[in-house]
Amino acid sequence: MSSRWYPIYQRGNPQLRVFLPNFWLKLVRPANEQPPNVVQFACSMEMTRHDVKNYLEKIYNVPVVNVRTRIALGGTKRDLVLGYITKEEDTKYAYVTLPRTKQFTFPDIFPTDAKQKIEDDKKSLEDAKKNHKKFLDKNKDRPGTPGWFSI
């Protein structure tokens, strides 16, 4: 499970060891609508259902009822210049079912305040574009004259 080698036991040495697996688990927003107690994760290809369940229960204290996994094939792309084909890496997805009493809602990363700020920034950008276009239109009849040489 892990590629780390631990030192050989010698009498008198402290034996406090931390086991760090080479696994990773990433929370993914599902493409299709899922029930509220089903959570989708992208995980490393080496993880099994049992590994995913233990990972969530032991490290994060998340109660798990069922785990289903699937492997999504990576897409293929043709190079535009040389014409050879490359394949993206396959990804493994784990669908974790929580108890019926537990519900998971995907966190709102961009709250309404941030959305409002983004809209304000877009509006100010549009105003700047409009003013620049008006400035360019004003100097159309004087080609070759620098912009600072205006009234």
UniProtKB/Swiss-Prot annotation:
GO molecular function: structural constituent of ribosome
One matching Pfam family: Ribosomal_L23
Subcellular localization: Mitochondrion
Keyword Transmembrane: no
Record carries keyword Mitochondrion: yes
Coiled coil regions, renumbered to chain: none
Bias-annotated ranges (Basic and acidic residues): 120-143
Keywords, sorted A to Z: Mitochondrion, Ribonucleoprotein, Ribosomal protein
Any Gene Ontology biological process: mitochondrial translation
Cellular component terms per the entry's GO annotation: mitochondrial large ribosomal subunit
Region spans: Disordered: 120-151
PANTHER family, sorted: LARGE RIBOSOMAL SUBUNIT PROTEIN UL23M, RIBOSOMAL PROTEIN L23-RELATED
Membership in a protein family: Belongs to the universal ribosomal protein uL23 family.
Oligomeric and partner information: Component of the mitochondrial ribosome large subunit (39S) which comprises a 16S rRNA and about 50 distinct proteins.
Name under which the protein is recorded: Large ribosomal subunit protein uL23m
Source taxonomy: Eukaryota, Metazoa, Ecdysozoa, Arthropoda, Hexapoda
